[in-house]
């Protein structure tokens, strides 16, 4: 391990032990704000500290084992042990590098997930319903809460478009690579001759912005229209102008919400989605401008992004970005998405690592 990284880790280790001591101090315990702040920092450092301690223990074992090489009787055993320890150390060093990667500040945020049917007509809308159920089930596995913000039903089933708010720590970080085009290849229920059709849905995942960011929006940039709800709502449907449509004039972004009976609640929801979209667009443009010449696995949520193909006849799911193929379509649609999500996150981390050769701790 390079000396600069060792210094960085030693510094973090000292800070970890310092906080550990402070958290048992009565003065700190009595100060709730300080205690909470230190607890959060302690939690952030715990994984990197654990890996560093493991690395130091492993390094100590290497030094001890090298001494055994001088013993002719133990030489072969010691050599095998050194090979095992060397592999273990390299694995720990890789884990440490990943833990020291620059964090996306939005990764721990809640997110909005939007699904829009694209090419394929009714079949695309039906598949958007399949994707919606897939993400809802995955959210349930993660113990995240979901709340539908807006949806437009399709006559043959599914949705023309649907927006869901997903609340749970790390939901954006886990789902952000879902943004892009999702293509389905199957025989539609409406197909009488058994021909396979290809349809596409577009998924966009954006972080929910804090309330203070929403308050900064210039009201003069917004056009707010109210109209009568056309969705569920019992006797209140079509009797009051509770539905809200907000247009951000400079960007042309439009968000509708008619899920709530209250116009005020619909407006708050629509505004939250709108501002999150605007901020996400700004982040994308910044990322595009500052990007080093490397592939960007994080999609834009545009039709041009081709993420996955779901082939029903072959029970196959293909992630085109990393050439990953799995034959468990039923399980994937049942919400068991980690088989696709974890590899793309690992690939992204590997890409970032390969471009961090000049970072301060390497």
From Swiss-Prot:
GO terms for molecular function: translation release factor activity, codon specific. InterPro entries: PCRF (IPR005139), Pep_chain_release_fac_I (IPR000352), Pep_chain_release_fac_I_sf (IPR045853), Prokaryotic/Mito_RF (IPR050057), RF-1 (IPR004373). It comes from the Bacteria. The modification N5-methylglutamine is found at residue 235. Its main location: cytoplasm. Methylated by PrmC. Methylation increases the termination efficiency of RF1. It is found in: Cytoplasm. One of its GO terms (cellular component) is cytoplasm. Keywords: Cytoplasm, Methylation, Protein biosynthesis. PROSITE patterns: RF_PROK_I. HAMAP family: Rel_fac_1. Peptide chain release factor 1 directs the termination of translation in response to the peptide chain termination codons UAG and UAA. Belongs to the prokaryotic/mitochondrial release factor family. This is Peptide chain release factor 1. It comes from Buchnera aphidicola subsp. Baizongia pistaciae (strain Bp). The gene is prfA.
């Amino acid at each position: 391990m390079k000396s600069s990284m060792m210094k960085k880790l030693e510094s973090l280790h000292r800070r970890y032990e310092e906080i550990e001591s402070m958290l048992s101090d009565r003065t700190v315990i009595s100060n709730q704000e300080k205690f909470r702040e230190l607890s959060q920092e302690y939690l952030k450092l715990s994984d990197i500290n654990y890996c560093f301690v493991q690395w130091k223990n492993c390094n100590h074992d290497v030094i001890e084992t090298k001494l055994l090489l001088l013993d002719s009787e133990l030489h072969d055993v010691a050599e095998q042990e050194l090979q095992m320890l060397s592999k273990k150390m390299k694995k720990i060093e890789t884990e440490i590098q990943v833990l020291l990667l620059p964090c996306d500040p939005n990764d721990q945020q809640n997110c909005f997930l939007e699904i829009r049917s694209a090419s394929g007509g009714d079949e695309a809308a039906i598949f958007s319903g399949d994707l919606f159920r897939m993400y809802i089930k995955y959210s349930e596995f993660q113990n995240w809460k979901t709340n539908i913000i807006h949806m437009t039903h399709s006559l043959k089933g599914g949705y023309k478009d649907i927006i869901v708010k997903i609340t749970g720590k790390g939901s954006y970080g886990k789902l952000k690579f879902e943004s892009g085009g999702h293509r389905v290849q199957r025989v539609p229920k409406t197909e009488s001759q058994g021909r396979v059709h290809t349809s596409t849905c577009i998924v966009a995942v954006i972080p929910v912005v804090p309330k203070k960011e929403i308050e900064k929006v210039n009201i003069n940039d917004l056009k707010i229209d109210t109209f009568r709800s056309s969705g569920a709502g019992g006797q209140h449907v079509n009797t009051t102008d509770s539905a809200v449509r907000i247009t951000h004039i400079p960007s042309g972004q439009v968000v509708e919400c008619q899920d709530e009976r209250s116009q005020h609640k619909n407006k708050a929801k629509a505004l939250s989605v709108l501002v999150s979209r605007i901020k996400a667009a700004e982040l994308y443009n910044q990322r595009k401008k500052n990007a080093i010449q490397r592939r960007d696995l994080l999609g834009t949520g545009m039709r041009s992004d081709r993420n996955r193909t779901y082939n029903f006849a072959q029970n196959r799911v293909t992630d085109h970005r990393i050439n990953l193929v799995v034959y468990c379509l039923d399980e994937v649609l049942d919400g068991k998405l980690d088989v696709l999500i974890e590899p793309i996150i690992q690939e992204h981390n590997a890409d970032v690592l390969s471009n961090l050769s000049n970072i301060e701790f390497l």
